[in-house]
Amino acid sequence: EPRVNATVILASSELPDEGARIGGGTYLAKPGSYRVGGLRIEGFAAPHDRVGGRRFGQATVWRWQQAGLNFAHLGGTAAKLSGEDKVLLGRPDVLIIGVGGGGKVYNGEEAAEVVRALNPRRVIPVQYVNGEAPSGCDQGGVQPFLDAMSGMKVRNVGPNLNLPGNLGDNTVIEVMR
C-alpha cells in the first residue's frame, strides 16, 4: 500500500475495495460542500454503476478550483453523465477520470464519450491496471481509452504532473505511470 500524506483525500465511496484511508489528511467521501486547506471542494452524488446505482449505490463526483484551474474528479463511476451532471461539472480545465472498466469504472469507450462531452483541456486517466491484472481484478489497462481517443495528444508524464497556468484550448491526455 502506498504511504502518502496529503491535505485532502477525495474518495468516490466507502466501499471496502475503494476509499481505504491509507494516508494522512482530511478524508472526504460524501456529497457536500467543504473547505479544506484554502480549497472549496464540492461533491455531488452520481450513480456508481451502469444500472442507476442499484448495484453499488451512489458515488461522489468532485469539483474544485485550485491555482486558477477548474478540476473535476469523476473517480469511481460508470454511469452515463446526466444533463444535470454536465451542468454541475461545466468545462473543467482538468478532468480526472477512471478508464479501466469493470463494474464501477468507465471502460475506455465510455470514458472517451465523457471526455468528448466535457471537452476538458487536460485529462488524467486513473483507475486502470498498469501491467498484468491481479487475479479477480475486473479492470483493464489504459490503452483502450487511448485508442478511443485516437488523434488526441498523449503525454506520458511519470508519477508527477506539473500543470502550467495556461493550458491552451486543445485537450491533452496526461498518463501518469
PLM feature segments, named:
Residues 1-8, 15-17, 24-90, 94, ...:
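Core dinuclear metal-dependent hydrolase active-site scaffold
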Residues 6, 92-96, 108-128:
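Proline-aspartate-enriched helix->loop->beta-strand connector
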Residues 14-15, 128:
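Residue-level marker of positions within ordered structural domains that often coincide
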Residues 16-21, 132-134:
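Short, charged/polar "capping" segments at the starts of alpha-helices
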Residues 40, 122-177:
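Binuclear metal-ion centers of metallo-dependent hydrolases, dominated by the metallo-beta-lactamase
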Residues 60, 85-88, 110-114, 141, ...:
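A general structural detector for well-ordered alpha-helical segments in enzyme core domains, enriched
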Residues 81-82, 103-109, 132-137:
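Extracytoplasmic/secreted cell-surface and envelope-processing proteins
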